Amino acid sequence: MNYLKDLKEQFTFDQLLLIFTCFSFTFPFYILGPILLIEFIYLLVSKKAIIALKQTPQIKFLYLFVLISLSISIIHKNILGALATLGIFIVIILMVYYRKHINQSTFEFIIDMLIVLSILWAIYGIYEQFQIYHRLGVDHFTFKVYARRENRLNSVFYNANYYAMMIEFIAVCTVYKFFTVKNNLKISIFYVIVGFLNLFMLYMTGCRAG
């Protein structure tokens, strides 16, 4: 509880909402989607999104893109295309709004949070891989990677390619943190270990990038 209290004192409500949004990207898409939609509705109802859009230069090009893309999808009865357009619009609105509220401390906190979370993803992913080996009757220490979707490592993301994408993002974050840490050998070693752990997990996902 004290930790949550410290967070409330350190960050504003909008910054905490941004942190939670970044945290929610670790959820499966069917949980992430409703969360982003609820945040989008909140920003519209509170008029915070409208104010942010008015203060954003060249925003008319975003409206034009959404209008053209949505019109083409509707004309061709492409429901998925229309939903994808709306999804992109919602994400851009959130980015435009939160750009006003992010600062260095918020950015650093989000990066560290995701790096720590990646360790938990890896632990669960290794457990999941052992379960796959057990189901297939394979020795647990063969480190064999399979191509079939049902035999690929997903961790908490329910999709191997999405997990691989998140690992690649975490790799960039660890490199950034490694080069920005000054005079702290233990922290530097920590980032190196986490980096190699995630590269190993990237290989185990079976993604081409691995």
Per-range role (PLM):
Residues 141-152:
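Luminal/periplasmic active-site loops of membrane-embedded glycosylation enzymes
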Residues 84-87, 154-158:
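Alpha-helical membrane-interface segments at transmembrane helix boundaries
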